[in-house]
């Protein structure tokens, strides 16, 4: 029996909801035949795909081991848990949810500390005065070490955080923190501020491929089908379909529309009867419609696109190139 193609997605909360919605929009609805509490699922029409519901950190670990082919997880977890992440996994595409920044945050009372260079001065002075290093509370040990080294900050020690990291300075278990934030509101509520150059990583949920997975011919074909769906939906979301027909429609008019409105003519120029189909960025719809009517069109129709299937699939090409390395 051929081994299944394993797609790992988050097992709870908003990340699970957003991941399921993302795949559903691409025509890849995930389902749990065993019920809502089942940790295994399927994709209709792709019988060889097994959906594994795991925590975000478990997904990163399984991608590193190659025990799943695709996974949905944050870049922050990949960079933290996989030392040579760019060699072992491929971030195929950002999914537009799960946004969070990994940041260096210090007490707001440190009014003279605004940059990593300021922090270097403060940590050096702190060690000279107290004969110990400043403590940094964080779950992101590897990211912190790398970022601090890049800024030549050495007089610190990491206190691994198991709970609410932002509370560490207030309770006296650390002087500063490295943590994730979306709006900064929680940090501010705890009397902390992000350094001006203290954003270590701008993360979001990604569709990720594992180099060490079993990439049989069947697995590659399954990946191509999945990525074809995703790419088709992504193309469709960028445009509205505009259709019209009038005698004055010609190649010169089309060239001007391309230049002014950023349209794409997926089926070529106007037909002999003046029929024209264009794909237009949504923000340019009214301008394009006015332009076409000014040049002789009586009617211009606009429709939403569900999918735009193209011969070339940049997502699969990216995966194929990664697996050849």
UniProtKB/Swiss-Prot annotation:
It is found in: Cytoplasm. PROSITE patterns: ATP_P_PHORIBOSYLTR. This is ATP phosphoribosyltransferase. Its main location: cytoplasm. The lineage of its organism: Bacteria, Pseudomonadati, Pseudomonadota, Alphaproteobacteria, Hyphomicrobiales. It comes from Rhodopseudomonas palustris (strain BisB5). Feedback inhibited by histidine. It catalyses: 1-(5-phospho-beta-D-ribosyl)-ATP + diphosphate = 5-phospho-alpha-D-ribose 1-diphosphate + ATP. GO terms for molecular function: ATP binding; ATP phosphoribosyltransferase activity; magnesium ion binding. Its cofactor is Mg(2+). GO terms for cellular component: cytoplasm. Its EC number is 2.4.2.17. Keywords: Amino-acid biosynthesis, ATP-binding, Cytoplasm, Glycosyltransferase, Histidine biosynthesis, Magnesium, Metal-binding, Nucleotide-binding, Transferase. The gene is hisG. Pathway: Amino-acid biosynthesis; L-histidine biosynthesis; L-histidine from 5-phospho-alpha-D-ribose 1-diphosphate: step 1/9. Catalyzes the condensation of ATP and 5-phosphoribose 1-diphosphate to form N'-(5'-phosphoribosyl)-ATP (PR-ATP). Has a crucial role in the pathway because the rate of histidine biosynthesis seems to be controlled primarily by regulation of HisG enzymatic activity. Belongs to the ATP phosphoribosyltransferase family. Long subfamily. One of its GO terms (biological process) is L-histidine biosynthetic process.
């Amino acid at each position: 029996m051929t081994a299944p193609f394993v797609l790992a997605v988050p097992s709870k909360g908003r990340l699970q909801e957003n991941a399921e919605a993302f795949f559903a929009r691409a025509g890849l609805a995930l389902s749990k035949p065993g019920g809502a509490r089942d940790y295994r699922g399927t994709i209709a029409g792709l019988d060889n795909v097994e959906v594994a519901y795991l925590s975000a950190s478990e997904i990163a670990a399984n991608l590193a081991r190659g025990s799943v082919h695709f996974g949905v997880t944050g870049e922050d977890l990949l960079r933290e848990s996989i030392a040579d992440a760019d060699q072992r996994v491929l971030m195929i595409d950002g999914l537009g949810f799960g946004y969070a920044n990994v940041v260096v945050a210090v007490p707001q009372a440190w009014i003279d500390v605004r940059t990593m260079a300021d922090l270097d001065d403060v940590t050096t002075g702190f060690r000279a005065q107290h004969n110990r290093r400043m403590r940094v509370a964080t779950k992101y040990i590897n990211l912190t070490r790398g970022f601090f080294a890049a800024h030549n900050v050495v007089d610190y020690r990491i206190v691994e955080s198991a709970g609410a990291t932002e509370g560490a300075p207030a309770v006296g278990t650390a002087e500063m923190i490295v943590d994730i934030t979306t709006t900064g509101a929680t940090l501010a509520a705890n009397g902390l501020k992000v350094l001006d150059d203290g954003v270590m990583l701008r993360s979001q949920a990604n569709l990720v491929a594992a180099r060490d997975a079993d990439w049989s011919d069947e697995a590659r074909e399954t990946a191509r089908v999945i990525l074809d769906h995703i790419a088709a939906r992504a193309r469709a979301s960028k445009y509205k379909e505009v259709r019209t027909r009038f005698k004055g429609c010609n190649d010169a008019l089309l060239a001007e529309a391309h230049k002014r409105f950023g349209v794409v003519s997926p089926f070529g120029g106007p037909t002999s009867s003046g029929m024209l189909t264009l794909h237009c960025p949504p923000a340019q719809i009214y301008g394009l419609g006015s332009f076409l009517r000014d040049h002789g069109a009586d009617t211009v129709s606009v429709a939403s696109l569900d999918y735009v299937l193209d011969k070339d699939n940049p997502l699969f090409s990216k995966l194929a190139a990664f697996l050849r390395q």
